[in-house]
Amino acid sequence: MDKLLSLLGVSILAGLLLEAFAQTDLTGKVFVFPRQSETDYVKLIPRLDKPLQNFTVCFRAYSDLSRPHSLFSYNAEYGENELLIYKERIGEYELYIGNQGTKVHGVEEFASPVHFCTSWESSSGIAEFWVNGKPWVKKGLQKGYTVKNKPSIILGQEQDNYGGGFDNYQSFVGEIGDLNMWDSVLTPEEIKSVYQGVPLEPNILDWQALNYEMNGYAVIRPRCVALSSYNKIS
């Protein structure tokens, strides 16, 4: 009897864990953050956990926010803004690595779907930016740095500490989808393929096999914006 109860307990625990940490093919779907808050977010669990000397992150976002907001927040256990993608305003993005940031500017339309990619190479410190398949100006930061592992990766909020410290005035409101991350710098040809909807086997975060945890009022819905809508800005 005790053995049966023990097995039942293990089964219930396993079920709860599966609900909390789902691995799902999210092709054609988006995370929707419907409101400004400090409680609504999605935690992403990486497939590969290692210190990073190179990376590429790509995703699609659709929002009508005009205030500053976080798009991708990756914090290490010790330190702040280990890897942060932040949007200050229309046509202005910030990339932070090891709590040092750089800004990039370009042409965007308000409340238009955006496909965004950024990559960074430690050996040169060069960060590249691509918006709707078009390259923006390259910048440099944190040459020789290594992005720490064991991250807390959050969508919908900006972390001021490891896994928390949220501010509703920095929260994201809108849709995020097709988020993938690699431990390498993708070539321009590969970036264009990703922009066209080819994921190219991401090994850190894979939208087609994503581990995530939903928190607060965040939901999954079919993507209503066609991929062709992301090439309005050229």
UniProtKB/Swiss-Prot annotation:
Residues that hold Ca(2+) 1 according to the record: N81, E158, Q159, D160
SUPFAM superfamilies per record: Concanavalin A-like lectins/glucanases (SSF49899)
Location(s) in or outside the cell: Secreted
Record bears the keyword Glycoprotein: yes
Glycan attachment residues as annotated in the record: N54
Cysteine disulfide partners in this protein: C58-C117
Cofactor: binding details: Binds 2 calcium ions per subunit.
Gene Ontology MF terms: carbohydrate binding; complement component C1q complex binding; metal ion binding
Cited InterPro entries: ConA-like_dom_sf, Pentaxin_CS, Pentraxin-related, Pentraxin_domain
Keywords: Acute phase, Amyloid, Calcium, Disulfide bond, Glycoprotein, Lectin, Metal-binding, Secreted, Signal
Cellular component GO terms held in the UniProt record: extracellular space
Domain Pentraxin (PTX): 27-226
Coiled-coil regions listed: none
UniProt signal peptide: 1-22
Quaternary organization: Homopentamer. Pentraxin (or pentaxin) have a discoid arrangement of 5 non-covalently bound subunits.
Additional information: Plasma concentration of FP are altered by sex steroids and by stimuli that elicit an acute phase response.
Similarity section: Belongs to the pentraxin family.
Protein name in the entry: Serum amyloid P-component
Species of provenance: Mesocricetus auratus (Golden hamster)
